[in-house]
Amino acid sequence: FDAIIHLAGKAHDTKNQSAAQSYFDINTGLTQKIFDFFLESSAKKFIFFSSVKAAADSVVGDMLTEDVIPAPVGPYGESKIRAEEYIKEHFAFPTASSCECSPFREMTSVTEKQVYILRPCMIHGPGNKGNLNLLYNVVKKGIPWPLGDFENRRSFTSIDNLCYVIEGLLTKEVPTGIYHMGDDEALSTNELIAIMCEAMGKQPHIWKMNKGFMEGCAGLGTLLHLPLNTERLRKLTENYVVSNAKIKAALGID
């Protein structure tokens, strides 16, 4: 085989019911075993699905780039960055100070292997089971969206764009590195609701309920284990814009 794509892992738990160690056992421990296998195998390329949450739980400034110093919050992001660190400890990744005489360059050329750490933001497409599925069910059932008072911008990754990037990494000569992944345009949650309604031929019902009231409801939802809790409210209403400039440049995408 020519490549290994490692996308198995434990997803972020919006209900906060999973034991922290389970994230490290799966997202870190499993990655270590698979990467060790890759290094001993004849495969030339390794693609590891990390997450933007390994870089930052929230975005400071206009957008999140690969230059950020990772500061994950919680076991999901922490387990992902731990896996990234293991990969970088066992394979020569380019650095800002790399040059032609760098031993990192020599090691990479000798092994003739390439390693890609992908950090996609929230992925959307058929079969989505996360917060986007919650939004879909809200629209499908005709339930009014009560969070219209929250104005935000958030990056998403379509499954089609993600597959296109994977194909590019497998078929083109792309340098080893860390790459963020997101669609070109960031959307607000309200815009996303409107798009879903249009796709299903429904009228959007977006209510601008008081922010403080909705935050209180989310807090109650955390205590009662309801679908809308504090963590889910934050994820649905926060600003989280991710730059895709590096991966587009690497693949020659205008």
PLM segments and residue spans:
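Substrate-positioning beta->alpha
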Residues: 128-134, 148-170, 176-177
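Conserved Rossmann-fold NAD(P)-dependent oxidoreductase catalytic core, especially the SDR/UDP-sugar
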Residues: 33-75, 94, 111
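Mid/C-terminal beta-alpha module of Rossmann-like enzyme folds, strongest
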Residues: 172-228, 244
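NAD(P)H-binding glycine-rich loop region in Rossmannoid oxidoreductase-like domains
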Residues: 1-26, 37-40, 54-55
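Active-site Tyr-X1-5-Lys
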Residues: 71-94, 110-116
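Flexible, glycine-rich beta-alpha linker
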Residues: 74, 113-134
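C-terminal amphipathic/interface module of NAD(P)-dependent oxidoreductases
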Residues: 187, 205, 228-254
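Glycine-rich NAD(P)-binding loop of the Rossmann-fold in SDR/ketoreductase-type enzymes
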Residues: 3, 22-33, 70, 74, ...
